[in-house]
């Protein structure tokens, strides 16, 4: 029986971020919708043809999105929140983007992390009046486009249970699972229309099966898939991001034609699926890592697949573990990477080739791919033996860590008193999260410096001028605690990684974070070492320009780890401690330079949490330890801040408190401060700054909205522990909206401060 290869999804952004550029020019009114859609069509077509040329047998259609695939599902199902005023007609691009980005009248829909990745999805909103209807023909048009190119298409849908699970109820006392009977008929209609277009297989993604589901959700799978399996299409139930063997009996009994399992992040589950009788189903093995960029050990994987094929009575397919959305597009575009390191890597285009190599090896025998396997073995040997990887100084420092290295000198209450004596801040102190708008002037100066078109002195002068201006603007607005604005930084991880040993960088290694926002994760390939101070001179200069405190701004060890492509040859906990020691040294240098407030951002802290609760403790233990190692070497008078975003903290608040940061700022505005209730119930002991406005939308909220959120926060939290700040950094915003919003924020804080002190 011939083994097929198929892909679960391909990056949407384009090899040169063409989609980002098209979206942003469209939003600025510099091109029309036809130009935007033409760019999207060109990217989709290029993706299909690339996969076809690589030899992929079944090519995904429906994985592309202009903004987010969950938002696309909301659009396809007509589940538009009432507040956006949809009349029941077809959904326009303006309405689509309004849901994602907000309007002058309506805040954007909430955005949160896609499982434990750095991708973000738009959260569906449900209430008891939510109705579903087939409201878009985009998927069907794309299928017809693919067929016209001779593509063997596999349609891609988010499954009904995952769609409901990832949404939120916007009215109390209502359970979104109760919407399933209304939802399933529309799914049936979609599947029947797909079948009418001649598509045999539908990939129906249910990644929530990697979670510990409550019984009502587990029970609903049988109802859903008995309803959907009407024979119109063959259904490939697709799971990823972890093991699903805790749902083995459920999966065995579901009326689906195939199952996809992730045997890259959870190789141990393969044995369960080979031992149980799944012979009536196609089994797709996600053996190529869809979330990291290391070249696969093809010899070992071919051996594993050969053994699986000999034991599995049904049809076996080869796939990536998950969509390749999380990987850069093509390694061939990297012309400046060290050849040795480049030889260790595989981006999305190369992962297609790895899949087809494994398929050919299974179908035609090992000898048919012997040369490729030999090259793979040599790359693996090179990486294992490379002198770039290991630094004995770093290993010794990690080995010598003691419990004292992760403890502050005294408890928070003592520190708070000393810090208030030092800084004399008012009630409800105002601050920002760190970055300010990256203007064209800033970006041009950085680019010119990288190209040696600016001397070091000229660059220093340009950045200092920007810092002076940012300090001036903050003082003019009336903020209490200032930042230097980060004009010298391109990215909060890349900036530090460029100054640490053990990191490498790409030119075009972009991946989508949300919408048009792309990030270029650095490659953490070896032991991490800080050869010299990274931020001290910038922060010292900023502090010299004002009598108000200026925060030192650092990225925390867990975020440095989570937002990099991390080496897979040692435990992540070890790499986190190496990063923590590098940051600890920077914290010490900042303190010695007279900087009294140091912010260590950990926006990715929850992102690293394993999907199953049984695995949480191990992760939280080492993640908390890493942060405390980074932050605990300072005096009591030095105030440690941290920032976290897009996170549901309800279930990990004890670990957040264990970080023992003096001040935590969090994103709360999109969720209308819902998160604060959890902090109150837990009695969070330290100071907290809940974001009072959403910086991910160009919309500047009314002062009344900010004031109400702030007043609500003051009811939840002791005002003596409350800070006032935006949700996140302001790098992606422009100055006019930034100044307007911050001025409103400061005015609201002053108004409430006066009321509380009256």
Curated annotation (Swiss-Prot):
Its cofactor is Zn(2+). GO terms for molecular function: 5-methyltetrahydropteroyltriglutamate-homocysteine S-methyltransferase activity; zinc ion binding. Binds 1 zinc ion per subunit. InterPro entries: Cbl-indep_Met_Synth_N, Cobalamin-indep_Met_synthase, Met_Synth_C/arc, UROD/MetE-like_sf. Keywords: Amino-acid biosynthesis, Metal-binding, Methionine biosynthesis, Methyltransferase, Repeat, Transferase, Zinc. It catalyses: 5-methyltetrahydropteroyltri-L-glutamate + L-homocysteine = tetrahydropteroyltri-L-glutamate + L-methionine. It comes from the Bacteria. It holds the Pfam family Meth_synt_1. The keyword DNA-binding does not apply. L-methionine binds at residues 433-435, 486, 601. Pathway: Amino-acid biosynthesis; L-methionine biosynthesis via de novo pathway; L-methionine from L-homocysteine (MetE route): step 1/1. The keyword S-adenosyl-L-methionine does not apply. The active site is at residue 696. L-homocysteine binds at residues 433-435, 486, 601. GO terms for biological process: methionine biosynthetic process; methylation. Transmembrane segments: none annotated. Catalyzes the transfer of a methyl group from 5-methyltetrahydrofolate to homocysteine resulting in methionine formation. HAMAP family: Meth_synth (MF_00172). Belongs to the vitamin-B12 independent methionine synthase family. This is 5-methyltetrahydropteroyltriglutamate--homocysteine methyltransferase. It comes from Nitrosomonas europaea (strain ATCC 19718 / CIP 103999 / KCTC 2705 / NBRC 14298).
